């Protein structure tokens, strides 16, 4: 494939400035506030965890299964998926829950739709959706990695795929919320600190990305895609509020996971001192998905390691507010843009 080129009018966006105090507390956080010890029995509850074949997704699936939940491990099928499920079953032999592989390829929107339709054909309840899966293609310096629909790989897999999957599951989530205890049906959007370190000033991520992304490094593209997840999590809280569904964008922390598998040796060595075991990322995901300290009033709030509400960069907060509220309304506009990109599959 020919290396990607930006159109002549494209230019790199201005990034906002993350306060040092914010960066420090997210890179070197206090001890976890929510662990396996805090989790209730989840018998009868059903969850989907995307990207469950390794790392944080696998750990989160294990923890939910250990509390007797039925967990749909949404991931690309194959030997790796089967091995991940077998590993969890061996680790938790006494669980009365269930593990089910749900084939999901976020790089193909038609496959995303098929996965959602398969789940809905099997289940009438869904108590939590954890959009954990993501890709970081650090060796794609020429911008040649694309999805089946031709989108740049980071925005396609990390932003549009999860968005479509969530929209297609809204009905079953809403139906479950109508029967469940208030504030217990939730969606978790796994973002990263890249939202604050790289995200566009006042916007996080915008539709302009489709023009300027060839000007950015693969690491920057990844960070910007995570800003997209933050926008989705914040806006979803508003759009789904009437359904009784809570939504939380999170920074799972800097973790030892396969997310960095594309990075070179020096890159991995540089990160080693600040990387934590995958279980710590699961603690953040499960705090967002299960903690009884969270309620409707918190929906849409930024959650950071290892399970804390924390203020997002102030200029980004403006994106979550309408003009009438003193903001710029960008989160709403970005949601509408995402809908436009996936409308053929809704």
Swiss-Prot record:
InterPro entries hit by this protein: NAD(P)-bd_dom_sf, SDR_fam
E.C. designation(s): 1.1.1.-
GO MF term set: oxidoreductase activity
Residue numbers annotated as active site: 191, 222, 226
Swiss-Prot/TrEMBL keywords: NADP, Oxidoreductase
Cited Gene3D superfamilies: NAD(P)-binding Rossmann-like Domain
Keyword Protease included in the entry's annotation: no
Pfam families attached to this UniProt entry: adh_short
Reaction equation(s) it catalyzes: dehydroprobetaenone I + AH2 = probetaenone I + A
Pathway: Mycotoxin biosynthesis
Region (Disordered) location: 1-35
Binding annotation for NADP(+): 56, 80, 105, 132, 222, 226
Its biological purpose: Short-chain dehydrogenase/reductase; part of the gene cluster that mediates the biosynthesis of betaenones, phytotoxic polyketides involved in leaf spot disease in sugar beets. The first step of the pathway is the synthesis of dehydroprobetaenone I by the polyketide synthase bet1 and the enoyl reductase bet3 via condensation of one acetyl-CoA starter unit with 7 malonyl-CoA units and 5 methylations. The C-terminal reductase (R) domain of bet1 catalyzes the reductive release of the polyketide chain.
Record-stated family: Belongs to the short-chain dehydrogenases/reductases (SDR) family.
PANTHER family: RETINOL DEHYDROGENASE (PTHR24320), SHORT-CHAIN DEHYDROGENASE-RELATED (PTHR24320:SF236)
The protein's name in its UniProt record: Short-chain dehydrogenase/reductase bet4
Species of origin: Neocamarosporium betae (Beet black rot fungus)
Record gene name: bet4
